[in-house]
Regions:
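Active-site-proximal beta-strand elements of phosphoester/diester hydrolases
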Residues: 1-10, 96-108, 135-139, 190-196, ...
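Active-site environment of divalent metal-dependent phosphoester hydrolases
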Residues: 10-15, 36-41, 73-82, 92, ...
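Core catalytic region of metal-dependent phosphoesterases/phosphodiesterases
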Residues: 11-94
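Conserved acidic residues
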Residues: 27-29, 132-134, 170
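Redox-cofactor binding/interface segments in oxidoreductases and associated redox assembly factors
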Residues: 30-31, 100, 138, 174
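Active-site-proximal segments of metal-dependent phosphoesterases and phosphodiesterases across multiple
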Residues: 36-56, 134-168
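Conserved beta-sheet core of the metallophosphoesterase superfamily
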Residues: 71-73, 98, 148-211
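Binuclear metal-dependent hydrolase catalytic cores centered on His/Asp/Glu-rich metal-binding motifs
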Residues: 95-135, 153-162, 216
Length: 220
């Protein structure tokens, strides 16, 4: 199976429209959170939430028109509830692989949504039965993989990394840290930070073949 994974579109509809350009080359499209835009923070929370929900509606319509199998999760900058066939809310098996959504992120200085401490991350990950047939569709990166900030410091979760080292899923797909769109191996697990350059309207991500585990960067 060929997967295209991206993340952090942040309401940029130019980026969403570009998903059409990769759809024909893959079997599955995954968007790893932060769907809604960041504009409009001065509005009431309800208005802002509805604004973001319209971004999710637009993404869903794009995915529906593409017709390639697709799923997305929400991230820490998404402040809305959502119901949609493309929204991966529970474990699903697609093409013989188990896809597990994981929307939590490690605590940040910005008091965003879905933030938890390392102990909570460890607890939530402990609920899953995972292994070499598992693809984690996550938002947060593990420590030392796709987690480098603009100042060079690492901000990933040590418990997420420990879980990956122990369980060894096939893939950990994430975003969250826009500065570190990268690929890293942790043992037999390939960690791909798929975050877009949303301010400039640049679609970024990775195409990965789950049979051969070959992967290539995409930037459009």
């Amino acid at each position: 199976m060929k997967i295209f994974a991206t993340s952090d579109v942040h309401g940029n509809r130019r980026i969403m429209d570009k998903l059409n350009t990769v759809a024909a080359d893959v079997d599955l499209i995954l968007v790893c959170g932060d769907i809604g835009g960041k504009d409009g923070r001065g509005k009431t929370f309800r208005q802002f939430s509805e604004y973001q929900k319209r971004d999710a509606d637009y993404l869903s319509s794009v995915l529906k028109d593409i017709e390639t199998e697709s799923r997305f999760i929400l991230g820490n900058d998404d402040w809305f509830e959502y119901e949609d066939s493309h929204y991966l809310q529970k474990v699903e098996t697609i093409g013989g692989l188990k896809f597990i959504p994981f929307e939590y992120v490690l605590l940040t200085p910005f008091n965003t949504n879905r933030e938890v401490n390392d102990n909570k991350l460890e607890y939530e990950l402990g609920k899953f039965s995972a292994g070499s047939n598992t693809v984690m569709v996550a938002h947060t990166p593990p420590l030392g993989a796709g987690d480098i900030l603009y100042n060079g410091s690492h901000c990933g979760s040590r418990y997420v990394r420990a879980w990956i080292e122990d369980v060894q899923p096939k893939l950990w797909l994430c975003g969250h840290i826009h500065e570190d769109n990268s690929a890293t191996w942790i043992g037999d697990t390939l960690v791909l930070n798929c975050a877009c350059n949303y301010p400039d309207g640049v679609l970024r991500g990775w195409i990965v073949d789950t049979d051969t585990m070959e992967y290539e960067a995409v930037e459009i």
